[in-house]
């Protein structure tokens, strides 16, 4: 098979011409604009493809020459002449296609990472920028800010909204934007539209925020990124929960919708708004509804049905409020927030975009209403069914046969006209004067007992309320509405009506008269409080009739409450006794002086220092006498019988004709008394020490033990001749006493006379007489003892 060389020669020529055209086009484009990195990459790929196509052809001498010529023409510029053979040899070899592509990718990466230098507005960086660059930057900033707000206006806005911000809010972008939003609203409402203030341009939130950040010192750190902060704030605000209300009329046929002031077109929605920080959801709904409509549903209803939906990644919760009067004058409480407020029929509202609107609703948009319409219609239908069912049950219900139905016969409701609509009573906010006036008590003449219908059968003199147990029975012959006022000489409970001061009339039966006032002795320091007749009952205090026991309150209020002096030896007698309130009242009487009787803990004291005292911390407490004597150990003489003895309960004495108890619980320890036999006994020492601690605790503490108190009480009141035996002390005390019969009791150890052994101390007397005798020779060394 022969291959013609002419065809092979033609193909390279055509390809070379095509490649020349491509190279010329690329060179023309490069003269117009510099090639980008992408264009360079495409060109290198095209060249690599052409090279691969040529390499697939058969290798002959002529194609090789043509290929070299084609490469030289493609690489040479359009205006430059074709290089000669010598110049071709001098040209350096170019890198491979892969190396060139890697280099181009590296250059593109470096060009993308480089950012244009930003000119700083701080004072320290102004020296690094030239004057033209600074001037251009200021011109750009001036165009960015828009109309300039006066400086004094910015100062006032900073004082109102920025100066009071805490540090944590200043460092929070979102909280700063919330404060700037409030400042912008205040600027538009009170400064731009005020004729008295001139030079306040109407700027948008973007320009306003930038000027405030430039003016306020604490917000200057946000000036260079005001757009970024504002974008984050708008994104965050779209996720803040929204709360509002669905206001429905009493018939539940119509609902209130509002139109925003800046809304484009006739867009309608429910009154709602964003919740504030740390605000309860229901309070936020009440606040937003009141700001947009002037209707405060917080005083109209206590519990509402809630509807909740998520719209554009934001939660919207609405509270359905029923029985809203249709004649209420809705007025927005904020400026430039609500344009219109109207009633719409619930059944005519669309539930989807494809629903056809009635003719009178054509042109209106309900995009923010449609997600809730279907749920509202279902709820309204159920409520209407419940209302019809209740009316039917009320008509078919029969009166009950209980006793209350006989006492209170059911009366038919007044006729209601057909055209009348059920309305809920209107309430208003009370002022402080109206609120406190409601707690004032009416005069005594205006207070009356509740009236009841006639009973069947009628019984003369029967108090219906007393039979039912509602009120206290009245005094026979007293009128239902006649009450006596409270006396002026003492404070009384003014919450109930007064009544006569007759005790039998107050409680309905005669009170027992066997309760007597405690007798006060002549030496009592409160003798001026005593009445003339000591056995007369206490003076009755006037009180009024009521369900509370006011006699108890008045008795406590009028009883003298003076504390006893600590040095008083008079009997402690209560000043008032509430015997009718206690099942078995305590009636302490004055105790006459009697002979002392041994008690459970030792000998009884004299009557003057052994009285019963009703104190706050103990039911019965023995009052310690103030005539205690401090006697040194084994040095003082025995006291006389005329003086008052110590009030210690651990003393031991013997009374003529009465048995005595010798207990080893003296205040003198065995160590100080020097009793060897007691110390030597193994168990006696522990028993003596325990009894000393018990006596010291009961004497020095605020109250004595229950066992000692009960024994002391019986000893003081009964005064029996037979001593009261204590089983606790009887078991061991008598055993110790039998062992120590030959010893001197510890409690009387200090009463013995002291005798010094003179012979043991100074020696025999004969020795001293011999030493100082004139007959004996005088010794220079002095007396010497044997």
From Swiss-Prot:
PROSITE patterns: NUDIX, NUDIX_BOX. Its EC number is 3.6.1.62. GO terms for cellular component: cytoplasm; P granule; P-body; perinuclear region of cytoplasm. Mg(2+) binds at residues 288, 292. GO terms for biological process: deadenylation-dependent decapping of nuclear-transcribed mRNA; determination of adult lifespan; mRNA processing; nematode larval development; nuclear-transcribed mRNA catabolic process, nonsense-mediated decay; regulation of locomotion; reproductive process; response to heat. It is found in: Cytoplasmic granule; Cytoplasm, Perinuclear region. InterPro entries: DCP2_BoxA, DCP2_BoxA_sf, Dcp2_NUDIX, NUDIX_hydrolase-like_dom_sf, NUDIX_hydrolase_CS, NUDIX_hydrolase_dom. The keyword S-adenosyl-L-methionine does not apply. The keyword 4Fe-4S does not apply. SUPFAM superfamilies: Dcp2 domain-like (SSF140586), Nudix (SSF55811). A motif (Nudix box) lies at residues 273-294. Residues 134-144 have a biased composition (Low complexity). Belongs to the Nudix hydrolase family. DCP2 subfamily. May be a component of the decapping complex composed of dcap-1 and dcap-2. Decapping metalloenzyme that catalyzes the cleavage of the cap structure on mRNAs. Removes the 7-methyl guanine cap structure from mRNA molecules, yielding a 5'-phosphorylated mRNA fragment and 7m-GDP. RNA-decapping enzyme although it does not bind the RNA cap. May contribute to gene regulation in multiple RNA pathways including monomethylguanosine- and trimethylguanosine-capped RNAs. In oocytes, may play a role in the response to stress induced by heat shock, osmotic stress and anoxia. Required for the developmental axon guidance and regrowth of PLM touch receptor neurons. This is m7GpppN-mRNA hydrolase dcap-2. The gene is dcap-2.
């Amino acid at each position: 098979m022969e291959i013609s060389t002419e065809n092979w020669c033609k193909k390279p020529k055509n390809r070379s011409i095509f490649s020349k055209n491509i190279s010329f086009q690329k060179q023309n484009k490069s003269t117009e604009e510099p090639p980008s990195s992408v264009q360079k990459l495409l060109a290198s790929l095209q060249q690599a493809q052409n090279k691969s196509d040529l390499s697939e052809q058969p290798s002959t001498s002529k194609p090789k020459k043509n290929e070299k010529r084609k490469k030289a023409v493609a690489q040479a510029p359009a205006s430059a002449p074709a290089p000669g053979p010598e110049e071709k040899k001098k040209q350096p070899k170019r890198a491979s296609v892969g190396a060139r592509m890697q280099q181009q990718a590296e250059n593109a990466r470096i060009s993308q990472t480089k950012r244009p230098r930003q000119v700083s507005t701080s004072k320290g960086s102004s020296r690094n920028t030239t004057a033209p660059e600074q001037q251009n930057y200021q011109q750009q900033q001036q165009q960015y800010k828009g109309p300039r707000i006066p400086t004094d206006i910015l100062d006032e806005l900073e004082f109102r909204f920025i100066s009071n911000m805490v540090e944590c809010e200043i460092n929070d972008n979102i909280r700063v934007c919330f404060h700037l939003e409030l400042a912008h609203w205040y600027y538009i409402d009170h400064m731009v539209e005020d004729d008295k203030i001139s030079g306040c341009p109407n700027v948008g939130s973007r320009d306003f925020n930038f000027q405030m950040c430039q003016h306020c010192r604490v917000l200057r750190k946000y000036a260079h990124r005001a757009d970024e902060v504002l974008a984050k704030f708008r994104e965050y605000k779209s996720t803040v929960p929204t709360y509002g209300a669905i206001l429905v009329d009493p018939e539940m046929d119509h609902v209130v919708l509002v139109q925003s002031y800046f809304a484009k077109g006739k867009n309608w929605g429910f009154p709602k708004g964003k919740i504030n920080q740390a605000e309860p959801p229901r309070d936020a709904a009440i606040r937003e509804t009141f700001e947009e409509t002037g209707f405060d549903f917080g005083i109209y209803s206590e519990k509402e049905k809630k509807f909740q939906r998520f719209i554009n990644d934001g939660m919207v919760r609405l509270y359905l409020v029923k029985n809203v009067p249709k004649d209420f004058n809705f007025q927005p409480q904020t400026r430039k927030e609500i344009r219109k407020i109207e009633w719409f029929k619930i059944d005519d509202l669309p539930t989807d975009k494809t629903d056809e609107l009635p003719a009178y609703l054509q042109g209106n948009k309900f995009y923010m209403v449609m997600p809730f319409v279907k749920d509202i219609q279902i709820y309204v239908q159920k409520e209407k069914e419940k209302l019809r069912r209740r009316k039917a049950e009320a008509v078919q219900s029969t009166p009950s046969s209980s006793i209350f139905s006989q006492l209170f016969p059911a009366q038919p409701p007044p006729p209601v006209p057909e055209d009348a609509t059920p309305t809920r009573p209107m309430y208003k906010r009370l002022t402080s004067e109206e609120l406190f006036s409601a707690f004032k008590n009416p005069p005594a003449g205006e207070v009356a007992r509740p009236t009841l219908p006639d009973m069947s059968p009628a019984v003369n003199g029967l108090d219906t309320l007393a039979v039912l147990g509602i009120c206290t029975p009245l005094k026979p012959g007293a009128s239902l509405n006649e009450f006596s006022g409270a006396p002026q000489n003492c404070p009384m409970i003014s919450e109930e009506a007064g009544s006569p001061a007759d005790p039998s009339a107050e409680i309905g039966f005669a009170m027992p008269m066997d309760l007597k006032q405690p007798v006060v002795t002549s030496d009592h320091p409160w003798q001026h409080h005593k009445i003339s007749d000591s056995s007369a009952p206490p003076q009755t205090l006037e009180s009024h009739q009521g369900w509370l026991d006011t006699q108890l309150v008045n008795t406590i209020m009028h009883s003298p409450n003076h504390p006893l002096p600590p040095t008083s030896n008079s009997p402690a007698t209560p000043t008032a006794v509430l015997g009718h309130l206690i099942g078995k009242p305590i009636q302490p009487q004055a105790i006459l002086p009697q002979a002392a009787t041994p008690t459970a803990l030792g000998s009884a004291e004299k009557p003057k220092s052994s009285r019963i005292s009703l104190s706050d911390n103990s039911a019965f407490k023995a009052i310690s006498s103030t005539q205690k004597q401090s006697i040194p150990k084994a040095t003082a003489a025995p006291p006389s019988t005329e003086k008052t003895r110590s009030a210690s309960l651990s003393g031991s004495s013997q009374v003529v004709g009465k048995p005595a108890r010798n207990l080893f619980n003296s205040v003198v320890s065995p160590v100080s008394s020097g009793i060897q036999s007691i110390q030597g006994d193994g168990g006696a020492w522990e028993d003596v020490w325990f009894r000393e601690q018990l006596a010291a605790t009961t004497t020095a503490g605020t109250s004595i033990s229950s066992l000692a108190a009960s024994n002391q009480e019986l000893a003081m009141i009964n005064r029996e001749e037979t001593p009261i035996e204590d089983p606790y002390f009887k078991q061991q005390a008598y055993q110790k006493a039998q062992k120590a019969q030959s010893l001197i009791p510890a409690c009387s150890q200090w009463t013995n006379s002291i005798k010094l052994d003179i012979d043991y101390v100074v020696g025999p007397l004969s020795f001293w007489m011999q030493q100082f005798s004139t007959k004996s020779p005088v010794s220079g060394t002095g007396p010497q003892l044997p």
